[in-house]
């Protein structure tokens, strides 16, 4: 039997995050040499990462970081395979660390984020791979949002009380109004609008909706002369449902979101809604 102590096992667990039995086995194979055991566990961990690549990661958490003065904010989605891991402190600490890094580093896109150093000599991609190995599940970072310049706030929604937030919303107003920002963010969490305004809907989507409306109207046997007016009405209905500004406001459905913003004297510059796995 290799010569090592309980303190060596503890040290190895702290260095690698591996389980006790894995650490003991690694120390046995390394004949008590902690450095060699660390290397062996890292190699084993990377092999485990490769094996998990084909598996699905549909659980996880959304984390937000908002500047104290509300001039900037981020949302980060980190996914895992099971809700058991998602509930765990280690997984949530990893997600929070990445969100804090995004807030400081302001990466241009996901590729830049993964390539950036979260710790000296360690990229975010390596950090995620390390979490993958330590937690024993596929861990995926493939989405984040970052706003700055206006009044930024977030709303986080838990779908289950024992899980971390599964839905996160980031909103940016042109001027401070915490009450309106919170209300609109809650509305977005609940109603999941696809676009901010009618002008933001891609032309190809509008044309597709128009074709569907025309075909549906003809199939209903409506008079050809009435077709343009009916189609336009249905298209306006689509805009009302799909755009945030067109939707009835969740906290006062007699008014549209646009009307609520106008009455408050603010405009919504942009928003992002992230739901884990979707």
Swiss-Prot record:
A biological-process GO annotation: translational elongation
GO-annotated molecular function: translation elongation factor activity
Main localisation: cytoplasm
Annotated keywords: Cytoplasm, Elongation factor, Protein biosynthesis
UniProt-listed SUPFAM superfamilies: Elongation factor Ts (EF-Ts), dimerisation domain, UBA-like
InterPro entries attached to this UniProt entry: EF-Ts_dimer_sf, Transl_elong_EFTs/EF1B, Transl_elong_EFTs/EF1B_dimer, Transl_elong_Ts_CS, UBA-like_sf
Location of the protein in the cell: Cytoplasm
Coiled coil regions, renumbered to chain: none
Annotated region described as Involved in Mg(2+) ion dislocation from EF-Tu, given as residue ranges: 82-85
Annotated GO CC locations: cytoplasm
Top-level taxon of origin: Bacteria
PROSITE patterns: EF_TS_1 (PS01126), EF_TS_2 (PS01127)
A Pfam family this chain is assigned to: EF_TS
Biological role: Associates with the EF-Tu.GDP complex and induces the exchange of GDP to GTP. It remains bound to the aminoacyl-tRNA.EF-Tu.GTP complex up to the GTP hydrolysis stage on the ribosome.
Record-stated family: Belongs to the EF-Ts family.
HAMAP family per record: EF_Ts
Stated name of the protein: Elongation factor Ts
Lineage, highest ranks first: Bacteria, Bacillati, Actinomycetota, Actinomycetes, Kitasatosporales
